[in-house]
Design a protein with these regions (language model features):
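General beta-strand structural signal in soluble alpha/beta enzymes
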Residues: 44, 90-91, 174, 215
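Conserved phosphate/anionic-ligand binding catalytic regions in large, soluble enzymes, centered on
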Residues: 9-26
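Short glycine/threonine-rich loop-to-helix capping motif typified by GTGT followed
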Residues: 51-59, 101, 187-191
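Generic N-terminal amphipathic, Lys/Arg-enriched alpha-helix
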Residues: 2-14, 213
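Non-transmembrane, aqueous-exposed alpha-helical and coiled segments at domain scale
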Residues: 32-41, 101, 108
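A structural-propensity feature for long, helix-poor, extended segments
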Residues: 41, 45-84
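A conserved regulatory-domain signal marking ACT and ACT-like small-molecule sensing domains
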Residues: 118-221
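Contiguous domain-boundary segments centered on the initiation and propagation of an alpha-helix
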Residues: 66-116
Length: 221
């Protein structure tokens, strides 16, 4: 734990857990979707559900979905800005048994119709943990360079991806693989010491059985 975990980041207030962390969850969802958000169904669990209006969690989540950083002054007006853009927003309270009290489950739809479901928690100091993506259990924080690959579970898939990273001399600091069952949906989460070139990401996306590959650059604040 470092100082920023205790005092939180530079942000639009009032709370690092309820605003900064929420904005980061929204921004992570936007980056993973890979396009502008047209519709968001936002299910709030625990303390998020109880205090989201008073603490600005709703504005922070939506601001993140619109691509805003935690210190963007437009976060305060994000609900108005979203509606002006025609974004459809649906908020509800949900009970996610056993989840962290500051957890949100969102299903977002992009302007092309692409959909993504994400479940993530704001765990303090503006930090987040993503726990589920499109129904698959995952764990990542976004504090490191992170490559998230949605693919079909198939022999040789891990070797193909890591081989392309090795060609660029990219070191893998941490790697986890999650799957629904053998031969079904799977997710690779790789934390990297460096940043892959666009050509490397395109080569990964071109592999057979790859559904999507998204790179999240390490947070700097």
């Amino acid at each position: 734990m470092d100082l920023f975990d205790l005092i939180g980041p530079v942000m639009i207030g009032p709370s690092s857990s309820h605003t900064a962390g929420a904005a980061r969850i929204g921004l992570t969802a936007r980056l993973l979707l890979g396009e502008e958000v047209a519709r968001a169904e936002i299910g709030l669990h625990g303390s998020f559900a109880k205090t989201y209006r008073g603490h600005g969690t709703d504005r922070a989540l939506v601001g993140g979905l619109m691509g805003m950083q935690v210190d963007d002054p437009r976060l305060r007006d994000s609900l108005t800005l979203a509606r002006e853009k025609g974004m459809k927003l649906i908020f509800s309270a949900v009970n996610l048994r056993g989840a962290h009290p500051n957890t949100v489950r969102m299903t977002v739809t992009g302007v092309t119709g692409r959909m993504l479901t994400i479940e993530a928690a704001s765990v303090g100091g503006g930090n987040i943990e993503v726990h589920r993506l499109d129904g698959l259990n995952v764990v990542f924080t976004g504090k490191e360079n992170t490559l998230i690959i949605h693919h079909t579970d198939a022999p040789g898939m891990i070797a193909a991806v890591t081989g392309l990273l090795a060609k660029e001399a990219l070191n893998i600091a941490n790697m986890q693989v999650y799957r629904r069952q053998a031969g079904a949906d799977a997710m690779m989460v790789l934390e990297l010491d460096g940043v892959p070139a666009p050509e490397t990401l395109e080569a990964i996306r071109a592999l057979t059985d790859i559904r999507s590959a998204t790179f999240l650059k390490r947070r700097t604040c």
